[in-house]
């Protein structure tokens, strides 16, 4: 085998489309049909254009309201998940992380009231829903809110 005998694998290289080079094949109108907007240079319509009909993105109702970019996103733990701890245990964000109920300390922890709790626990978290606080105290436990702003500084 010599250098001049090397050639690419069959079908690996495709000839480019040469348009407007004579009457055979793609000559004359170059695959653009006859006249009209799409036959002209730069003649494509913008995305979402429906031929002058009121487009779908204007026909549908808009989202309303305000999105607060500075809102605090919480790592949520439901009180039914706290039943995995022994009665009398002090539950903190550190113990929740060790138990795999939260992923990391990036977000503050909020305890919500889904499910029910059947043991007395001392729960420390950054935020509690009113119903969760009431259920923990009704089960004989204690609730302590941690100041999240103090942790950031």
Curated annotation (Swiss-Prot):
GO MF terms, alphabetically ordered: rRNA binding; structural constituent of ribosome
Region of interest: Disordered: 1-47
Membrane-spanning residues: none
InterPro entries xref list: Ribosomal_uL15 (IPR030878), Ribosomal_uL15/eL18 (IPR021131), Ribosomal_uL15/eL18_sf (IPR036227), Ribosomal_uL15_bac-type (IPR005749), Ribosomal_uL15_CS (IPR001196)
Keywords, ordered alphabetically: Ribonucleoprotein, Ribosomal protein, RNA-binding, rRNA-binding
Single biological process term from Gene Ontology: translation
Keyword Ribosomal protein attached: yes
Subunit comment: Part of the 50S ribosomal subunit.
Function comment: Binds to the 23S rRNA.
Name of this protein: Large ribosomal subunit protein uL15
Organism from which the protein derives: Dehalococcoides mccartyi (strain ATCC BAA-2100 / JCM 16839 / KCTC 5957 / BAV1)
Lineage: Bacteria, Bacillati, Chloroflexota, Dehalococcoidia, Dehalococcoidales
